[in-house]
Amino acid sequence: MACSMRVLGIDPGSIVTGYGIIEDCRDKLTHVTSGAISLSRITSFPQRLREIYERLTSIISSYSPECAAIEEVFFAKNVRSAILLSHARGVAILAAENARLPLHEYSPLEVKQSLVGYGRASKDQIEKMTKRLLNISQIKSLDASDALAVAICHLHTARTKERMGIAP
């Protein structure tokens, strides 16, 4: 079966970064792999950033996605948390860029609307729809589920643009 696109979805975090790779095979979404890069809070922040970068680089090398999709930073009440998240997001973007992967960015609202049709969907609703769309019974973590959701959002967006004759 010919697959048209393999996408790496990334849900960045300074303690846990989710990742998920899916393929679009003849308009059927297929789960390739997913998981979470879990880091110790007692490890220094620069070491955690290096670990995120190295693990994502290894995943990219092992699974050869054609592009990456990452969630944008959402509005955060805690400025420090938003800054830490932005650093983690930056090293994830660097891993994709160093692998020469086209990178697509989506807001949490866009991801939720793409999967559930409602921009204020709960994490549980996102996980249930992700499992349904990928025809899998279990996802290792909510972070992996969120990363898979970002990848699905990108494939839905790419399909729509293709059907409309708009370059992705």
Feature map (PLM): residue ranges:
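Phosphate- and other anionic-substrate recognition elements at nucleic-acid/protein interfaces
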Residues: 1-168
